[in-house]
Amino acid sequence: MTRQSTYSRDQLLASARGELFAPDSGRLPNDPMLMFDRITEISNTGGAHGKGVIRAELDIRPDLWFFGCHFIGDPVMPGCLGLDAMWQLTGFFLTWIGAPGRGRALGCGEVKFTGQVLPSARLVRYEIDVSRVINRKLVMAQTDARMLVDGREIYTAKDLRVGMFTSTENF
């Protein structure tokens, strides 16, 4: 498939099934772990560091699966799901640029949560800025990210790292 600058939910789910890029390339998780509905922008130029950018959105609905279990009587989106979305998008970027293998989160430098996503929210927006891409024996991207709910920044992460592995047997 030709590289695009935007992707719909159906296309993202095709990635989860191995149908968007090469069958042996990296994949996004399937529902319900896919944590965004669309990619509104992806580029290997631009962003805060000039090395690439990914922008994505998640429509918030009160019936999303995590609100029913986290927490009963006090529903809130788990912070780890927003962080995972940032890793998912970083891995998607590596697959999008043609990096071989399967993506795995390798860590991050710093994470801050300064707000929460409640069922009354409407839209989560992810803004990912690529700071480094290594494409040698080790294939890895490093990014900085922000998550906004209804336009307000609530999560930041620095130095998110995702690597691509042609074999995950010894990982």
Swiss-Prot record:
Localization in the cell: Cytoplasm
Coiled coil feature spans: none
Keywords, sorted A to Z: Cytoplasm, Fatty acid biosynthesis, Fatty acid metabolism, Isomerase, Lipid biosynthesis, Lipid metabolism, Lyase
Transmembrane segments: none
Top-rank taxon: Bacteria
Catalytic activity, EC: 4.2.1.59, 5.3.3.14
InterPro entries, sorted: FabA, FabA_FabZ, HotDog_dom_sf
SUPFAM superfamilies for the chain: Thioesterase/thiol ester dehydrase-isomerase
Record's keyword annotation contains Isomerase: yes
Keyword Isomerase belongs to the record: yes
Active site: 70
Predominant place of localization: cytoplasm
GO BP terms: unsaturated fatty acid biosynthetic process
Family of this protein: Belongs to the thioester dehydratase family. FabA subfamily.
Task performed by this protein: Necessary for the introduction of cis unsaturation into fatty acids. Catalyzes the dehydration of (3R)-3-hydroxydecanoyl-ACP to E-(2)-decenoyl-ACP and then its isomerization to Z-(3)-decenoyl-ACP. Can catalyze the dehydratase reaction for beta-hydroxyacyl-ACPs with saturated chain lengths up to 16:0, being most active on intermediate chain length.
Quaternary structure and partners: Homodimer.
HAMAP family found in the cross-reference section: FabA
Protein name: 3-hydroxydecanoyl-[acyl-carrier-protein] dehydratase
